[in-house]
From Swiss-Prot:
Protein name: Small ribosomal subunit protein mS25
Gene Ontology molecular function: any one: structural constituent of ribosome
GO terms under cellular component: mitochondrial small ribosomal subunit; mitochondrion
Annotated signal sequence range: none
InterPro entries: Ribosomal_mL43/mS25/NADH_DH, Ribosomal_mS25/mL61, Thioredoxin-like_sf
Family as reported in the entry's similarity comment: Belongs to the mitochondrion-specific ribosomal protein mS25 family.
Domain of life: Eukaryota
Organism: Rattus norvegicus (Rat)
Quaternary structure note: Component of the mitochondrial ribosome small subunit (28S) which comprises a 12S rRNA and about 30 distinct proteins.
Chief localization: mitochondrion
Keyword terms of this UniProt record: Mitochondrion, Ribonucleoprotein, Ribosomal protein
Keyword Mitochondrion: yes
Location within or outside the cell: Mitochondrion
Amino acid sequence: MPMKGRFPIRRTLQYLGSGDVVFKESVKVMTVNYNTHGELGEGARKFVFFNIPQIQYKNPWVQIMLFKNMTPSPFLRFYLESGEQVLVDVETKSNTEIVEHIKKILGKKEETLREEELEKQQRFHPGNFGPRKYCLRECMCEVEGQVPCPGLVPLPKEMTGKYKAALKANT
């Protein structure tokens, strides 16, 4: 992607991955109501410009809707799976204060994030074998340089048990 436009660093993977807001699974929709002018909505505008891309990257299951110039004061509304709505007033807050506030009320705890990362690393460890939904590889024959499965490619006769038993019987 070309590095053109307003603040193109926002579109790099490093920047997108550096966001620290990971919502709980119960958050389904996030709406941001803000104005494009006025001093009171400056934090909300910066939040939309700098932090919304990071939140979208870290939370792909959350639908994010932006409403411009439809409200006298900026606010965020979260729709939860249970049907509840959480309303957050962001009128006089800076973008970092907004991020910290929503991280505190609707974000996952640090311990939970660490546990999920550890589980993900264990699940996709290259030394684990099993069904695809649990492991990276189903069989040892998928590792490059290993002997293929006898069901797919017949083994050389020197590697079969019958041949070795026949050799021992003959000598």
